[in-house]
Amino acid sequence: MKVVEVKHPLVRHKVGLMREADISTKRFRELATEVGSLLTYEATADFETETVTIEGWNGPVTIEQLKGKKVTVVPILRAGLGMMDGVLEHLPSARISVVGIYRDEETLQPVPYFEKIVSNVDERIALVVDPMLATGGSMIATIDLLKKRGCTSIKALVLVAAPEGIKALELAHPDIELYTASIDDCLNEQGYILPGLGDAGDKIFGTK
């Protein structure tokens, strides 16, 4: 599995700001969008382009535009919604697929409760977004659903990842790509990433 930790100074700075204990909901949302945007920039670096001729202000001009498979953005509910706008800044025509999965706090296992995936997902590149890759259970379950629908081009974008989650994801889906703003130290006994960001969903939705 290709794992990319984006070490751009802007990314490192913004993730650092997100770690503040008393960060406001407004600021956390803004930063989640901004970092999601920067991760999208990295994750799409290998997208193919084609040369076309258009009518410019002073006559015909040759430009490059994206070609090949179109994109579906797949936020994992609910926290993944906090990164979605950052992806759509670069890919405004992307279709949106939604997967609802929550983590059982006792077993730490993923529990699916909702899915609405575009009908032609097998023809698209899926960008799966979720702020935290902790145990990896929710991401693995989401990718399982996408593959069952025939999707073969999948990239996962997360703000923070734990080594344990990366290992689990690689074992389950070695053919995908993972882009993260930070690989943190470890998980604690409750399955939270250390140093992490806290509960990203609560911070995005103001329910902390």
From Swiss-Prot:
5-phospho-alpha-D-ribose 1-diphosphate binds at residues 78, 103, 130-138, 199. Its cofactor is Mg(2+). Binds 1 Mg(2+) ion per subunit. The magnesium is bound as Mg-PRPP. Its EC number is 2.4.2.9. The keyword Nucleotide-binding applies. InterPro entries: PRibTrfase_dom (IPR000836), PRTase-like (IPR029057), Upp_B (IPR034332), UPRTase/APRTase (IPR050054), Ura_phspho_trans (IPR005765). It is an enzyme of class 2 (transferase). GO terms for biological process: UMP salvage; uracil salvage. Keywords: Allosteric enzyme, Glycosyltransferase, GTP-binding, Magnesium, Nucleotide-binding, Transferase. Uracil binds at residues 193, 198-200. The keyword Transferase applies. Allosterically activated by GTP. It catalyses: UMP + diphosphate = 5-phospho-alpha-D-ribose 1-diphosphate + uracil. Signal peptide: none annotated. Pathway: Pyrimidine metabolism; UMP biosynthesis via salvage pathway; UMP from uracil: step 1/1. One of its GO terms (molecular function) is magnesium ion binding. Belongs to the UPRTase family. Catalyzes the conversion of uracil and 5-phospho-alpha-D-ribose 1-diphosphate (PRPP) to UMP and diphosphate. This is Uracil phosphoribosyltransferase. The lineage of its organism: Bacteria, Pseudomonadati, Pseudomonadota, Gammaproteobacteria, Alteromonadales. The gene is upp.
